[in-house]
Amino acid sequence: MPGKFLTYNGSCIYYKTEGEGLPVILIHGFGEDGTVWRYQHTFLKNHFRLIIPDLPGSGKSELLSISPNNTSFVIDLYAACIKQILDQEDVQKCTMLGHSMGGYIALAFAQYNPERLNGLGLVHSSAFADSKDKKTTRRKGITFIQRYGAQEFLKQSIPNLFAEQFTREHPDQIEALIACAGNFSAKALVQYYEAMTERPDRTETLKKIVNPVLFIIGEEDKSVYLQDSLKQCYLPGNTQINILPGVAHMGMWERKDQTNDTVMKFLNYVSDA
């Protein structure tokens, strides 16, 4: 899958492209890079034009230089980075799927560029702002990262993204994701956590989306709880919902075949709309 680079706000940003047809951009989440979509990439590449970025500070992309006073706008900056990638690729409209933090970025993109989307997918993600308890948890995470470093934090937090049964049965998969996270800096993870903590509620954005919206939800997700996910599913006018039983926050790995089938059906639906 060919890799490309562009410069955004003075930082070098990496992304991959492959395939032809409906443009589909896959945005990874916190503590990941574009390779987290490996199973979806393999499944979709012969059917769609895939664009898979490494977000700033992830994978082969450089971190953005952000003032500590501007953390409330960082998710918007990431969304603007995605727009620049689409501009460079001369993609006027696309279907955008975001995992976790990637979903927050996709929603920011939808708020400012609704005319550029023909479909949106939230994969274990939420339009709601962080609750008070969630913000407290993230701030504790920032303290841990600053004290012990990025790798130690991810080594402890990544297993919690998976359902207990999957973790027991597939320790190699957990280790593979931890290995992918080996290049993160503490500064990058802190920037992500601050950005997520300060991001606004985007339920109004979700309500205004006229194109199809897909929700992929983990029944055992401890990061985006099932009951919270269900509250947002009825906000858009054209919704598809897939609840994955026995799955936590990583359906792309925990139930890759079911996730792939769900995404394929959604993208075909968008193509025919």
Task: Please give the residue ranges for each predicted region.
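Active-site loop/oxyanion-hole signature of alpha/beta-hydrolase fold enzymes
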Residues: Y8-K16, Y39-K45, I51-L97, Y112, ...
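Short beta-strand element of the alpha/beta-hydrolase
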Residues: L22-G29
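Serine-hydrolase catalytic-loop signature spanning alpha/beta hydrolases and amidase-signature enzymes
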Residues: G29-Y39, L50
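Alpha/beta-hydrolase active-site loop signature
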Residues: G31, L55-E62, A127, A248-G251
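Conserved hydrolase catalytic core segment
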Residues: Q88-S131
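Conserved alpha/beta-hydrolase catalytic His-Asp/Glu region
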Residues: A129-T136, Y148-K208
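Conserved loop-alpha-helix segment in the C-terminal half of the alpha/beta-hydrolase fold
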Residues: K208-A248, W253, Q258
